[in-house]
Amino acid sequence: MVVAAAIAGATTTDISNPEKPPPGHTGGFGEPSCISCHLGNDVNAFGGSVTIKGIPDRFIRGKHYPITVVLKAEETEVAGFQITARYNGSYDALYGKSAGEIRSINSRVTSTTGDNGVSYGHHTAQGLVTSSRDSISWSMEWIAPLKGSSVIFHVAANSGNGDNSPLSDLVYTSNEVSHPSLQ
């Protein structure tokens, strides 16, 4: 009984993140993912996926790249995501810090800096709305860093079933790596 009351109370404040997810939930660098709040299923369950389109194998320093996060999951009523770009070279003094800038190009995506100093791109309230029950995408721009080593992108996305509870939502994570151009 107490557990049910605690879960019911959590749904009104902790779990509902229509404006933005809490920073630091991409699943990368030891961070939790959306699964820490959206309970009931394993990460990457039931054949869905989240991918990042537009990440180059090799980036040119300072270049602007259009990127898109794509979530595919059946029966998605609402959805959200969080992405970060961080230095990945363990020998690099910048390891784990933000690499470049993720910039909004529309009202569906914005960014927030966490207490750890890392920048996170994520959905807005407008970005929760799906036009298809099987997929949703969010577009933004990544400005490649001017210095440093390889960059790893971590993304987590939540396929919500629309019942205003944290239960039975589906969470997906993925990552992509990009290396500096040899030019």
Language model: regions and residue ranges:
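Sequence context surrounding c-type heme c attachment/ligation sites in exported
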Residues: 5-183
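Sec-dependent signal peptide recognition
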Residues: 1-2
